[in-house]
């Protein structure tokens, strides 16, 4: 999500850091900033909300002493805690103005740490989780067993933090030193000649060096102009072979921005394990599901007697999946509406209605107007959004942010999986408030969600045959997608992706409707992709869809079946079988969607189209 750069060496750090931030603009951001260690033992911090040009204007006004120091940090922020404002932009510094930090990720236990610091008299200058880290390091550096030892102070604080994070610190009292660390979120080191770099990715330093190290899990590094020392969070540097990865960068800058992938969309598909994991982070605290911005009490949620979900495009498909989960867990009736239709049909809304509005950008015009219509009718409105501080969350009663990070590809991929995850969290929050799930049941469902990132990664690791399959069907005039239950919205999403990216005719159908018309389309060599339900979830649905597969195969179609590992009953009827791990019924879309994303992208590539920028489409639709 956020872009991080750190530099220590012989060159003026300001110029190096600002150039690095420009190279990392592709990551997306809502604010940016720099911390510069001056030659006179002081620290200068400059930060601005909005475009990087705003920061460049501010930096141009800095005194000459701030422009000549040779140690500095830079940051582009994608907001998670606190709105995208100047005061919440990074870097953050301690009260003495000596120590600065930049941060990517989430500190899950920040609320308790902040309370502890405030009890000690520390005053906070922002609404972020990040600021607790710099105040804790400042305390450790000035008092106690690590006093005067910058690196040891950082390590002592790291051991207290929960969550997924990358943290990079600079200290005006030790101007030639940077201390950085990572847990789960990426961090790479660039090894130069008399200079060292650290960044979120190699774009931070690729013009300066091609020699790099990827830090391992729960590792820290101390950087000086002369070299580096890597340790675990306990300070041990005897880490053994393979603890971190040394590599040479062969990519050019354009490839580095895409992480070595040909297109941003392919990179974003690969980022889906992190998108799901980050969306879950911090939402289960003391045995309860919590939202990011909760202005609805449990009593107000108990008063809800019906739910509407409003969204457009891919977000609408995630809303269809929300219906299955919310109805199953809460026994509340749920209607899913296209936002563009919702306010024009005079839906029945009142104070007992909860409207869930899903939007990646938070600016989707149809969804925004649906939110305003719901508010006019006194309904309660909850937003699921990927962009902190955008318009839709500002107008809602509660917010749950998907933390998928910036999505450059126009066709949504990682935000779709993050939206499904967020929808399920909303369902569990409602069940918890209404008492339709016992606390241990809510906890069990949450932990099942927590296991999904690893399973998503497993699917991604075995997906190559899908790309090869796409080559065979790249020139097909049409492709049909079939599913039942939660497989039906997945079929709709698969068809949409193929239409968006490959400009092919594709349709998704509920398999039970096959005999009511779509079977007339079946002919020789027509590719039909089937999302098979788990035989353990519903034996009846499984048997019925198996019957559908036999019907279409008997009419000459080519069957491409996505089924759970070990489902041998489907094998005789699948011309091509794509296997995914076995999970509970509601969680299957988080896995079965991935082959369809890869299939659509691969077909588009085979047809010679730009996967990132499909024709006639925009990432954020801000007009009706």
Curated annotation (Swiss-Prot):
Q: Does the keyword Transferase apply?
A: yes
InterPro entries linked to this entry: GATase_2_dom, GFAT, GFAT_N, GlmS/AgaS_SIS, GlmS/FrlB_SIS, Ntn_hydrolases_N, SIS_dom, SIS_dom_sf
Known catalysed reaction(s)?
A: D-fructose 6-phosphate + L-glutamine = D-glucosamine 6-phosphate + L-glutamate
Q: One GO molecular function term?
A: glutamine-fructose-6-phosphate transaminase (isomerizing) activity
Any Gene Ontology biological process: carbohydrate metabolic process
> Where does this protein reside within or beyond the cell?
Cytoplasm
Q: Record's superkingdom? A: Bacteria
Alphabetical list of SUPFAM superfamilies matching this protein = N-terminal nucleophile aminohydrolases (Ntn hydrolases), SIS domain
Instruction: List the GO terms this entry assigns under cellular component, sorted alphabetically.
Output: cytosol
Annotated CDD domains: GFAT, SIS_GlmS_GlmD_1, SIS_GlmS_GlmD_2
Where in this chain does the record put each SIS domain? 297-436, 469-614
| Alphabetic keyword roster | Aminotransferase, Cytoplasm, Glutamine amidotransferase, Repeat, Transferase
Show the active-site residues. Answer: 2, 619
Function comment: Catalyzes the first step in hexosamine metabolism, converting fructose-6P into glucosamine-6P using glutamine as a nitrogen source.
Assembly and interaction partners: Homodimer.
Please identify the protein, giving its name as recorded.
Answer: Glutamine--fructose-6-phosphate aminotransferase [isomerizing]
| Name of the gene | glmS
């Amino acid at each position: 999500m956020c872009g991080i750069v750190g530099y220590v060496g012989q060159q003026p750090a300001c110029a190096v850091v600002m150039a690095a931030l420009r190279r990392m603009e592709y990551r997306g951001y809502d604010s940016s900033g720099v911390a510069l260690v001056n030659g006179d033992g002081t620290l200068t911090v400059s930060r601005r909300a909005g475009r990087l040009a705003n920061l460049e204007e501010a930096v141009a006004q800095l005194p000459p002493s701030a422009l000549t120091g040779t140690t500095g940090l830079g940051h582009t922020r994608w907001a998670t805690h606190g709105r995208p404002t100047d005061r919440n932009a990074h870097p953050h510094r301690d009260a003495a103005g000596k120590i600065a930090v930049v941060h990517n990720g989430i500190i899950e236990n920040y609320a308790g740490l902040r309370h502890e610091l405030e009890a000690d008299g520390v005053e906070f200058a922002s609404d972020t989780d990040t600021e607790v880290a710099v105040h804790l390091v400042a305390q450790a550096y000035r008092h106690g067993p690590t006093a005067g030892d910058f690196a040891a102070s950082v390590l002592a604080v790291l051991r207290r933090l929960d969550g997924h994070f990358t943290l990079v610190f600079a200290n005006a009292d030790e101007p030639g030193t940077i201390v950085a660390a990572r847990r789960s979120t990426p961090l790479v080191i660039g090894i130069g000649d008399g200079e060292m770099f650290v960044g979120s990715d190699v774009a931070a330093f690729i013009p300066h060096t091609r020699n790099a190290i990827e830090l391992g899990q729960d590792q820290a590094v101390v950087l000086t102009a002369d070299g580096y020392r890597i340790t675990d969070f306990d300070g041990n540097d005897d880490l053994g072979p393979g603890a971190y990865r040394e590599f040479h960068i062969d990519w050019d800058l354009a490839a580095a921005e895409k992480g070595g992938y040909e297109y941003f969309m392919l990179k974003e598909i690969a980022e889906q394990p992190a998108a799901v994991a980050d969306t879950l982070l911090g939402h289960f605290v003391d045995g309860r599901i919590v939202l990011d911005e909760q202005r609805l009490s449990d009593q107000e949620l108990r008063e809800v007697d019906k739910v509407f979900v409003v969204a457009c495009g891919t977000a609408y498909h995630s809303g269809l999946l929300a219906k299955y989960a919310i109805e199953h867990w809460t026994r509340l009736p749920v209607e899913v509406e296209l936002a563009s239709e919702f306010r024009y049909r005079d839906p029945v809304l009142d104070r007992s209605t909860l409207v869930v509005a899903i939007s990646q950008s938070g600016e989707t015009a149809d969804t925004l107007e649906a939110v305003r219509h719901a508010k006019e009718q006194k309904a309660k409105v909850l937003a699921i959004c990927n962009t902190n501080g955008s318009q839709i969350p500002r107008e809602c009663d509660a917010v749950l942010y998907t933390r998928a990070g910036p999505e450059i590809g126009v066709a949504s991929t990682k935000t779709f999986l993050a939206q499904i995850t967020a929808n399920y969290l909303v369902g569990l929050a409602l069940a918890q408030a209404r008492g339709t799930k016992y606390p241990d049941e809510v906890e069990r469902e949450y932990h099942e969600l927590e296991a999904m990132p690893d399973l998503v990664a497993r699917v991604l690791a075995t997906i190559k045959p899908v790309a090869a399959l796409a080559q065979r069907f790249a020139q097909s005039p049409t492709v049909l997608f079939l599913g039942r239950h939660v497989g039906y919205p997945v079929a709709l999403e698969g068809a949409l992706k193929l239409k968006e990216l490959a400009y092919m005719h594709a349709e998704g159908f509920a398999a039970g409707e096959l005999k009511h018309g779509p079977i007339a389309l079946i002919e020789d060599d027509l590719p039909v992709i089937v999302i098979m339900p788990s035989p353990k979830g519903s034996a009846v649905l499984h048997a019925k869809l198996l019957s559908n597969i036999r019907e279409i195969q008997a009419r000459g179609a080519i069957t491409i079946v996505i089924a759970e590992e070990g489902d041998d009953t489907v094998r005789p009827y699948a011309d091509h079988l794509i296997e995914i791990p076995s999970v509970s019924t509601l969680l299957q879309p988080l896995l079965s969607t991935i082959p369809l994303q890869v299939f659509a992208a691969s077909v588009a590539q085979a047809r010679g189209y730009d996967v990132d920028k499909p024709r006639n489409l925009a990432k954020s639709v801000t007009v009706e």
